[in-house]
Amino acid sequence: MQIESDFLVIGSGIAGLSYALQAADHGKVALITKKEITESATNYAQGGIASVFSEEDTFDSHSEDTMVAGAGICHEDVVKMVVEEGPDVIKTLIEWGVNFTTRGDSYDLTREGGHSKRRIFHADDLTGREIERALVTAVFEHPNITVYENHTAIDFITERKIAKKQEVKNRCFGAYVLDVLGNRVKTFLAKITLLASGGAGKVYLYTCNPDVASGDGVAMAYRAGALIANMEFMQFHPTTLYHPEAKSFLISESVRGEGAILRRRDGTPFMEKYHKLKDLAPRDVVARAIDNEMKTYGDGCVYLDITHMDPDFIKTRFPNIFRTCLKFHLDMTKEPLPVVPAAHYLCGGVVSNINGETTITNLYAIGEVAFTGLHGANRLASNSLLEAAAFAGRAYRHSSERLTTEQFSFPTIPAWDSGTATDSDEMVVVSQNWDEIRRFMWKIGRAH
């Protein structure tokens, strides 16, 4: 079965949805997503999206914070572009229906680790869910977008793959996609293909990523011949809830931004010996500090304490975190929360330029799956949603212009060849291998 469109979008987080909404004004869009359309890392993002807004803040300050967090290997031109497009990104999201939290007649900006100013737009502590809600609503209302849920991309369709010759120009014509419920592989042909499949947190034993973040977008691009870079830079979020019944529940960095303090089991604060910003140090610093404290004292976790703040403020500012912790009989207004680091964000990925182009013609990559140069070795808090939305706009403008100025035709595309392999009757073998890989990656990550 072949499905043709002008644009094929793989992924339904802020990157894919933002691109689809803009591309749909220029042509037909097919959007595929592994599970339900809302099952993305965006939907789980709590903290917010960073952008210069107040008169006390500047683009230079935001850029400097970004490059310091990135350990000096950020691409300065990309940092400058993304930071300066921040206000327009916020404006566009608001126009699409995103309701950011306000205070009086302005927006309630918060601060997170590594930021020198309050510049984080948020929707309580469910910012990602609010963004996803607004964008999904707009996507379903657009007549030029067709959404295919429970569809998993398997391989890109490229000219080299078809011709079986490395010397031919490597162009992308779409992807082979598994219809999970129908148990068949479909051929999605498109003039422009956008990869926005997210990260690879599920490669690690402990992660705050959803199950769909398994890294297959990077793997597909690698098999197709795209350039991949900086895969060693996996960011670990410092504070996920340490509880046997809590599945990878993240405690937002904005909790520390509002005054929470990291403590040892005996109540001693420890971040002052690791960084001058103490609990507001960049994520990599805080995560390593927590890991070191756990190893030094033989503890399974450390504690995040915000009990010195007004209980009503805590409940109002962090309603989702407060309610979720109560389910596990933890009252953050009265007791510190046990927390540990977990795999959170892939700073490397598929190499893409300032317009989202990869090294394969007509294949674009944006969002967490891409390495754009913004984050360097370590992402600054709340820069991911900003990057995804900014690059969605740039990729749309560049790719839509290509549609206008170039002639497109599809060669004869062979049907998917499933080969002679058969499904294993013993799924426990797959599960065991997957578990061993995740344990190995976690062990290696902690060792370094």
Model-derived regions: residue spans:
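Glycine-rich active-site loop/strand segments that organize a redox cofactor
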Residues: S51-V82
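Glycine- and aromatic-enriched mobile tails/lids
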Residues: I3-S5, Q22, E36-T38, Y44-A50, ...
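A glycine-rich dinucleotide-binding beta-alpha-beta segment and adjacent secondary-structure elements
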Residues: E149, I154-R171, L178, R317-A370
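An anion/pyrophosphate-binding glycine-rich loop and adjacent beta-alpha core
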Residues: I37, M220, A226-D331, E335-L337, ...
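Core beta-strand elements of the Rossmann-like FAD/NAD(P) dinucleotide-binding domain
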Residues: Q2-S5, G182-I192, T359-N362
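Conserved redox-cofactor binding core of oxidoreductases
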Residues: E95-R184, L189, A196, T240-H243, ...
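N-terminal Rossmann-like FAD-binding beta1-loop-alpha1 element of flavoenzymes
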Residues: F7-L31
